[in-house]
């Protein structure tokens, strides 16, 4: 199949390799550009655990050795892998989404034992900080990057003949719809199948478009949709 990848380039390139190894043709059409906040730093508090919902949140942080010994909860396998590559000794993945991660944290940790360090981008698809605070935790959120909107080159050529479009967040889905509308490609964009990481992603698309939703919100489940 001829598939359009809408993820930021840093995330899209490894995915392109995976798709091509499965016999697909992959076109990069990033809707967002990752811009690190190089000034981000972590206050020296006695955190009882760390949470992150994004691999990018860890990529651009200068991780001090004191943080690597603190338990880290990642939302999925990619953020877990990045945590392990950055030297976190007690990292584990739970939930697959923000709600599951918050529920696991509330079941495993006690708010009275110390604050939580939450590493994230400026915009998130769900409010993990609010969920943790509702469970009684004090949360120190550090934003380590911004995901800045960008317009892919030659979107008309990309959409023409595409069999599918991969969308990983509600924000990306909304940006895709805006791009299609501003380019006058509504009819052509209705032809491909839209492979969505979650129901929330699918809900951001027009009701008439063909959609397939991953059984779990991770890349393995997304790739399984293509089999």
Residue ranges and their predicted role:
Residues 1-227:
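Signature of uroporphyrinogen-III synthase
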């Amino acid at each position: 199949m001829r598939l359009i990848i809408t993820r930021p380039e840093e995330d899209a390139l490894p995915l392109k390799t995976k798709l091509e190894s499965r016999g697909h043709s992959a076109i990069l059409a990033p809707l967002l550009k990752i811009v690190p906040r190089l000034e981000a730093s972590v206050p020296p508090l006695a955190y009882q655990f760390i949470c992150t919902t994004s691999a990018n949140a860890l990529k651009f942080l200068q991780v001090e050795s004191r943080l690597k010994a603190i338990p880290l909860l990642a939302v999925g396998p990619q953020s877990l892998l990045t945590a392990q590559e950055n030297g976190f000794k007690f990292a584990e993945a739970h939930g697959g989404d923000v709600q599951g991660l918050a529920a696991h944290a509330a079941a495993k940790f006690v708010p009275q034992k110390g604050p939580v360090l939450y590493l994230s981008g400026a915009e998130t698809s769900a409010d993990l900080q609010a969920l943790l605070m509702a469970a009684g935790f004090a949360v120190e959120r550090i934003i380590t990057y911004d995901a800045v909107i960008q317009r892919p080159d030659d979107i008309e050529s990309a959409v023409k003949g595409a069999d599918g479009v991969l969308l990983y967040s509600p924000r990306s889905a909304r940006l895709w719809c805006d791009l299609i509308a501003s380019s006058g490609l509504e009819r052509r964009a209705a032809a491909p199948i839209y492979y969505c990481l979650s129901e929330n992603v699918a809900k951001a698309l027009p009701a008439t478009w063909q959609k397939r939703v991953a059984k779990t919100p991770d890349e393995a489940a997304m790739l399984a949709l293509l089999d």
